[in-house]
Amino acid sequence: MTEELKSAIERAAAALKAFGAREVYVFGSAATGTMDEYSDVDLAVSGLPPEVFYRAMGKAGDILQRPLDLVDLDDDNPFIRYLKEEKELVRVA
């Protein structure tokens, strides 16, 4: 991951926290170091109020300037459980 992208992820995480997220994590290729120029950025949040989720996602995407996959860790579904159980999450903020 380039320093520029790392900085953008940190700024996106700060924006998500400004919208009310308690915690922000990165996962996927950005977390494992296998990201390339075509990769999206996978972020996970907890505590982000549902009424601002998509607005916050748009702001983070604008900062990143690449596709963003934002997941809510407060949801209870198999994918979220997998991320938590397999320790796939790297805390950003």
Where are these regions (language model features)?
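Catalytic core of pol beta-like nucleotidyltransferases
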Residues: 1-23, 31-37, 48-93
